[in-house]
Amino acid sequence: MEAKFFCFLEIIGVGYKASTNAQGSILYLKLGFSHEIRLQVTPSVRVFCLKPNLICCTGMDHQKVTQFAAIVKSCKPPEVYKGKGIQYRNEIIHKKQGKKK
């Protein structure tokens, strides 16, 4: 299977990690919750963890690749004050200013 479409997700935060099993059918996410999040990967999408904080979703169908990437991102969307969470690689997060004293 040749992959035409790619979607890179970046995990930002101390202790936040991603990994896959040997077949690449399950994505494990450690996002600061008390439990590990397991996501079943759809058969038409392949998922690779290039680094513990970089996820690559590939596939032939653009809609399915971006749909799975959106599901992964919805597990921990970027925070507006510190920017921690899961974001697309080329996404720009506009941070809010904190309280002024």
Curated annotation (Swiss-Prot):
<dbReference type="GO" id="GO:0006412">
    <property type="term" value="P:translation"/>
</dbReference>
<protein>
    <recommendedName>
        <fullName>Large ribosomal subunit protein uL6m</fullName>
    </recommendedName>
</protein>
<dbReference type="GO" id="GO:0003735">
    <property type="term" value="F:structural constituent of ribosome"/>
</dbReference>
<dbReference type="GO" id="GO:0005739">
    <property type="term" value="C:mitochondrion"/>
</dbReference>
<keyword id="KW-0687">Ribonucleoprotein</keyword>
<keyword id="KW-0496">Mitochondrion</keyword>
<dbReference type="InterPro" id="IPR020040">
    <property type="entry name" value="Ribosomal_uL6_a/b-dom"/>
</dbReference>
<comment type="similarity">
    <text>Belongs to the universal ribosomal protein uL6 family.</text>
</comment>
<dbReference type="GO" id="GO:1990904">
    <property type="term" value="C:ribonucleoprotein complex"/>
</dbReference>
<dbReference type="InterPro" id="IPR019906">
    <property type="entry name" value="Ribosomal_uL6_bac-type"/>
</dbReference>
<dbReference type="GO" id="GO:0019843">
    <property type="term" value="F:rRNA binding"/>
</dbReference>
<dbReference type="InterPro" id="IPR036789">
    <property type="entry name" value="Ribosomal_uL6-like_a/b-dom_sf"/>
</dbReference>
<dbReference type="GO" id="GO:0005840">
    <property type="term" value="C:ribosome"/>
</dbReference>
<dbReference type="InterPro" id="IPR002358">
    <property type="entry name" value="Ribosomal_uL6_CS"/>
</dbReference>
<keyword id="KW-0689">Ribosomal protein</keyword>
<dbReference type="InterPro" id="IPR000702">
    <property type="entry name" value="Ribosomal_uL6-like"/>
</dbReference>
<dbReference type="Pfam" id="PF00347">
    <property type="entry name" value="Ribosomal_L6"/>
</dbReference>
